[in-house]
Amino acid sequence: MELEKIRAIISADAARRQEILQAKSYYYNKNDILKKGVVVQNRDENPLRNADNRISHNFHEILVDEKASYMFTYPVLFDIDNNKELNEKVTDVLGNEFTRKAKNLAIEASNCGSAWLHYWIDEEYSGEQVTNQTFKYGVVNTEEIIPIYRNGIERELEAVIRYYIQLEDVKGQIQKQAYTYVEFWTDKILDKYKFFGVSCCGSQIEHITVQHRFNSVPFVEFSNNIKKQSDLSKYKKILDLYDRVMSGFANDLEDIQQIIYILENFGGEDTSEFLKELKRYKTIKTETDSEGDSGGLKTMQIEIPTEARKIILEILKKQIYESGQGLQQDTENFGNASGVALKFFYRKLELKSGLLETEFRTSFDKLIKAILYFLGVTDYKKIQQTYTRNMMSNDLEDADIATKSVGIIPTKIILRHHPWVDDVEEAEKLYLEEKKIQASKVSDDYNNFTE
């Protein structure tokens, strides 16, 4: 693709990029209330309204982390054609960082509507000879990625534009210099451009073309749902209103925290003298005017509608969790709840997580296929994925179901769903070893009996 066309595509991407950055700012508890406040303040015209509290609430962060932890506290398990040796190779390539990266993908997708994972081959050289190759992968900021799809029902990924800014040291300068990088990836090559400054419209410094060997665009999209909609879009307006009500409440408490004194025929020169006398002597002096009216002191206290604000805050908080499909809040005690009751408690979170899992299954399938291609494996049929939710459960019920399932369904499936089993392969190995020892013991006892 020509550079000018790439520049035009990046220029047209500003609105999408801004929307993504806004969602991320809410995740870091930097809501719009911090920029806008409750109302535009003009202290000269309205000196009684000086407070400008801007209270940002992190409901969005709570809901996103809740979903990511619910889905990816435990690693996704992959099984390729029930081939234990191949499964171990894939697990080794994924590495110890896989669970953390999967969780980060869920957070990024929840914030931005989609998350992107980039994979590549890290090569080690001895002279000009390649001595080692390692499959690497990592999560890329969504705002940096512009996907280009082929026309068709399946919307196959044709190319990816990635653009980002980097600060680099420059010889002879104390401060770092900003450079803009633009990468254009296809299924065969990478075109990489470097520009001076914070825009791809600056002067071009270098351009390199590199070939890669994956025969596919080395990026995988992980969508939050079929609409690629962020979680924030479901409840942003409600959250903004909650921030405004709470901030306005704090402003009222700060502005109207003192009693207003109404003075009649005060025998002093200014109000500061009145406050000094009241504080020091607990009394004030008053005078009688020309008409014979004596002075006096009255107080006025403004009532703040506390109860009304409390009610609307409770309604808004409940609606945030309803729209965000989060776990029910302020639940005091579940006790020894049954499995059915616990599933009902998680029902909304499970519905939301199920939409993400459906999209992630297809994406993880592409990642595993790329790893198998790197390993030189082509003769496989099925990639099975197993997800384990991080949720409260009734272990007694689960163990009872597992016991009653023995002899009805395969042992490996029982182990996969047993509440005490984290590593299915290890549990199966120990189980078979134990069965072997028991069989050997029975055989020895029989031989001793016959002798």
Curated annotation (Swiss-Prot):
InterPro entries: Portal_protein_SPP1_Gp6-like (IPR021145), Portal_SPP1-type (IPR006428)
Entry GO CC: viral capsid
Keyword terms: Capsid protein, Viral capsid assembly, Viral contractile tail ejection system, Viral genome ejection through host cell envelope, Viral genome packaging, Viral penetration into host cytoplasm, Viral release from host cell, Virion, Virus entry into host cell
GO terms under biological process: symbiont genome ejection through host cell envelope, contractile tail mechanism
Domain of life: Viruses
Presence of keyword ATP-binding: no
Cell location: Virion
Function: Forms the portal vertex of the capsid. This portal plays critical roles in head assembly, genome packaging, neck/tail attachment, and genome ejection. The portal protein multimerizes as a single ring-shaped homododecamer arranged around a central channel. Binds to the terminase subunits to form the packaging machine.
Protein family: Belongs to the SPP1-like portal protein family.
Subunit structure: Homododecamer.
Protein name, as recorded: Portal protein
